[in-house]
């Protein structure tokens, strides 16, 4: 016989966790959506609700239930409830993988503004796809309306210290089309203080740096989805954003006159994406095109006690990507092939040279299954790379294999995989000319730099135990000819790109996702602990200000939420990262934590959120540069990130039902896309 925990006891436990007294009565929410099967992916997982069928361990589907997710939550917030995802400063990554996963909405790249405005209630399911032809991806599938429907939401945010934001998501849906418009605006003021301690000729010098920056950002996104038949779907996305900043920094030094640097500038980005997929039987053909252009303009004005200087920097970058993919089945084999062409061109006032990059990639893959439980995934990525500057041309061929073997049981799954990847230097890195990143600091490129190669061997295991989803991974990573910037010992303000050395890393990752109290409380924890060794190349050991060495590292995220029957939701979110060891420095971070309370009104149309951001006061980083194990430079940065945020979300919509004669209206008017 199951034991029932009284709600008063549940609330007492939550009050001890949050330091807040709660009250409410039990109630189970409902949903009006159905999930239709998709032959592309096998295995369905449900967050904290029903039995999880792990299926293919590196291709999983999670259906997001409304229980535990705050009313008015957006898609980026919903991703924090997905098992096995880690959130970092660069974006989301899948547990046991070092690369940043690409986030998609219905197969098309998603911008941060679109993720922040897409309602979580519009999500049908979340697909976590690791490895394979397209790398790590997180694909958010939206619900599609079977009737005509107009809906939207407006988000307003106010934070202290000064930060104001506004965004909207307006969607018009029909059975064959979806039109979405997402405008957003942001204004903020940020203060960062830094303390630099540097040794020169055995004498220590101090330098205090204070930066104040005002940011104005505006963007708009238009997305059009068209489904002429159940076999053919198309997506067109256009986005424009402008990010302007205006700020100044003041520096006080022990041995040099104080100085003030005024900086103004803006960045404009224009992107377009087109995707089309046609499916017949067990096969489908997918075509994708991506066009992007970026303008960057910076104006610097330096004032010291002895002189004044002004500089203006401009850069223009264009990207063009085309991809086609064909997939089909033959017995136990699922064969796929894809071709991609990527062209990138950059012009910059930093350098008189124009940079061009052209990459042709042909990928051949095979997914094979042996019975119901055993399977494998094999991929060969053949690439031709051409990089051009006005003074040099680099050409190279690459053959990059990927392979995995997996076993999937009723409640558990295990996988062993191997991957070889190559990181290419950009135009800024191979450009041998020198350009200044500030009035005093400058960087030199390296025309003879080699590509960085990374070998990864991983063992992963997942298991479902009642309402708890466990995932673990052990990874071994070996990087050769690592690309990085090194500081010259004779001139610490000069940074030079080089193949600085090689590294070896071992990491053990653990993920826990569990629900309690009839799914009103949800815990999602992901963490990684490892040990890394950095070996400086012999030619840099005596001439560079480098750290190298070895040591442990750790990182992780925690999302703990509790929802009462009266639609109060309490959330604790934490993100931490331990010592970061690179070839040139060691860096320590303070953790970032915030507490949030959410309440919905007016039949869930209005949602209010109150957040306490980072009560420790600052996001602090402590960076140290060494030479022969003796610290030469220490840079401590304090980003004043504590504060309070008040958010308001208003949702609205209207459904237009259409029928002929005495045709009955089905109770379910929505289905998965």
Language-model features and meaning:
Residues 86-131:
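Periplasmic plug
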């Amino acid at each position: 016989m199951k034991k029932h925990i009284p709600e008063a006891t549940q609330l007492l436990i939550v009050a001890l966790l949050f330091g807040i007294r709660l009250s409410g009565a039990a109630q189970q929410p409902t949903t009006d959506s159905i999930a239709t099967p998709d032959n592309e992916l096998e295995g369905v997982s449900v967050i904290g609700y029903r039995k999880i069928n792990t299926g293919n361990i590196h291709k999983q589907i999670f259906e997001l239930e409304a229980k535990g997710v705050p009313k008015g939550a957006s898609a980026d917030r919903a991703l924090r409830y997905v098992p096995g995802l880690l959130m970092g400063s660069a974006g989301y990554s899948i547990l046991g993988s070092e690369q940043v996963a690409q986030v998609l909405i219905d197969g098309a790249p998603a911008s941060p503004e679109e993720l922040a405005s897409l309602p979580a209630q519009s999500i049908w399911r979340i697909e976590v796809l690791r490895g394979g032809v397209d790398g790590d991806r997180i694909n958010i599938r939206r619900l599609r309306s079977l009737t005509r429907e107009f809906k939207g939401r407006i988000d307003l945010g106010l934070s202290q210290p000064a930060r104001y934001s506004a965004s909207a998501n307006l969607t018009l849906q029909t059975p064959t089309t979806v039109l979405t418009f997402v405008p957003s605006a942001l204004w903020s003021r940020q203060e960062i203080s830094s303390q630099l301690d540097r040794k020169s000729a055995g004498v220590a010098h101090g330098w205090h740096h204070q930066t104040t920056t005002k940011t104005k950002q505006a963007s708009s996104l238009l997305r059009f989805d068209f489904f002429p038949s159940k076999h053919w779907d198309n997506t067109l996305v256009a986005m424009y954003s402008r990010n302007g900043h205006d700020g100044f920094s003041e520096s006080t030094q022990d041995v040099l006159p104080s100085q003030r640097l005024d900086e103004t500038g803006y960045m404009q980005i224009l992107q377009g994406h087109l995707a089309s997929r046609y499916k017949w039987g067990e096969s489908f053909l997918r075509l994708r095109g991506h066009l992007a252009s970026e303008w960057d303009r910076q104006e610097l004005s330096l004032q010291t006690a002895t002189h004044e200087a002004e500089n203006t920097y401009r850069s223009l970058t264009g990207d063009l990507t085309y991809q086609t993919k064909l997939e089909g089945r033959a017995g136990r084999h699922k064969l796929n092939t894809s071709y991609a062409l990527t062209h990138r061109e950059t012009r910059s006032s930093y350098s008189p040279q124009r940079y061009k990059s052209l990459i042709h990639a042909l990928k051949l893959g095979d997914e094979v299954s042996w019975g119901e439980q055993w399977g494998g995934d094999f991929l060969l990525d053949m690439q031709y790379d051409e990089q051009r500057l006005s003074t040099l041309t680099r050409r190279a061929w690459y053959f990059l294999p990927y392979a995995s073997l997996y076993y999937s049981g009723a409640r558990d799954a295990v996988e062993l995989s191997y991957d070889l990847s190559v990181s290419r230097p950009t135009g800024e890195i191979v450009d041998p000319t020198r350009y200044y990143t500030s009035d005093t600091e400058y960087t030199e490129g390296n025309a003879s730099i080699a590509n960085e190669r990374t070998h990864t061997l991983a063992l992963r295991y997942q298991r479902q135990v009642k309402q708890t989803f466990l995932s673990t991974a052990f990874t071994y990573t070996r990087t050769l000819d690592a690309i990085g910037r090194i500081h010259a010992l004779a001139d610490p303000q000069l940074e030079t790109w080089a193949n600085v050395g090689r590294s070896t890393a071992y990491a053990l990752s653990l993920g826990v996702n569990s629900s309690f109290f009839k799914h009103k409380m949800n815990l999602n924890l992901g963490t990684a602990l490892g040990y890394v060794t950095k070996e400086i190349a012999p030619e840099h050991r005596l001439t560079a200000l480098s750290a190298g060495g070895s040591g442990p590292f750790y990182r992780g995220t925690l999302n703990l939420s509790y929802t009462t029957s009266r639609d109060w939701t309490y959330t604790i979110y934490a993100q931490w990262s331990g010592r970061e060891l690179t070839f040139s420095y060691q860096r320590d971070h303070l953790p970032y934590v915030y507490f949030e309370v959410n309440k919905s009104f007016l039949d869930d149309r209005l949602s209010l959120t109150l957040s306490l951001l980072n009560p420790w006061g600052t996001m602090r980083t402590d960076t140290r540069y060494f030479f022969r194990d003796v610290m030469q430079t220490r840079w401590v940065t304090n980003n004043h990130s504590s504060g309070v945020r008040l958010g308001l979300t208003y949702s609205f919509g209207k459904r237009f039902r259409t029928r002929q004669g005495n045709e009955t209206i089905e109770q379910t008017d929505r289905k998965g896309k």
